[in-house]
Amino acid sequence: MAGLYLHIPFCKRVCAYCDFYKSADLRPMKAVVEAMHDELRREAGFLPAEQLRTIYFGGGTPSLLPPEELEEFIAHAAELFDCTALEECTVEANPDDLTPDYLRRLARTRVDRLSIGVQSFDDGELRLMNRRHTADAARKAVRQAQEAGFGNVTWGICKKATQLG
């Protein structure tokens, strides 16, 4: 079984708990996305006989990319790899990026799972973590994702948050 992980290393704001590679400077995003497509092309022979079962967009904040750009990555992967057995395509998302319009557009892609970075349902903890959303906004994002047709929605909780203060 093979999977493809695409790391989108950009964030509007850097969270206090995050150890992943990321940048709050969004200016090079277009160039990085183009470089990722180039690397996919270069490394396509790495999995010649494997069927991709999963595509996972992690970060950083993949939900900073328009849904159409995420779909371009999926289409590109399907050109380069055998995706006939694709079982799951996941996008990590911040609650504040998941507007009804964004979710509608994302639902028209092959993305079928959302991993929403809720981190906490406590506003005080969210402030400690330097998160942009509130607990109510997180609840709303999860509900709106389900209403947009996403039947596979997970939301992450970061319990080391109380140790940050």
Predicted regions and their residues:
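Local cysteine-cluster metal-coordination motifs and their immediate loop/turn environment
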Residues: 9-20
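Alpha/beta-hydrolase
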Residues: 6-8, 118
